[in-house]
């Protein structure tokens, strides 16, 4: 018989922030941690445009994806300090655009560090891009990783959030909530019914020791 937990799914929009290319990936993940790709793409902006117009293009693309695919949560990768401070600055602006898009849609927003995403998808927080892309394709049952890398990265971010459930900034515009890696909830009453059911299913899955999808054979 089919596992009833497979009927309980969460749809996550993962965003890999970038001003020239912003990866956007939507995945459905059930309570047994099986993941499937719903959409993947890259929002682009021309270097010939002024900065605020470039950001507007990225914002419009995120709004369109949210409107078309109706994710239940948005997850984005944390921007960390790098040598190129200008690049960090523009990427943080895109991150702000994504936060605003989630806020306009009334969606919870989660932030995950690059090492957290790598660890969730590959089991190694120091994995390189090729390893991440390979595991994204394997987890989602794809023949090959999506291109460019920004697209695959957005899917990895979505998978990371669906599997870990941490990093949430808020379930609603008037509240904050966190879901620990063990599935324990804080501010339970402020979660939506679907989010509460998902967290409980994830916690039960961890207790019963469900097979890690990264180790499943196709």
Feature locations, PLM:
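Phosphate- and other anionic-substrate recognition elements at nucleic-acid/protein interfaces
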Residues: 1-218
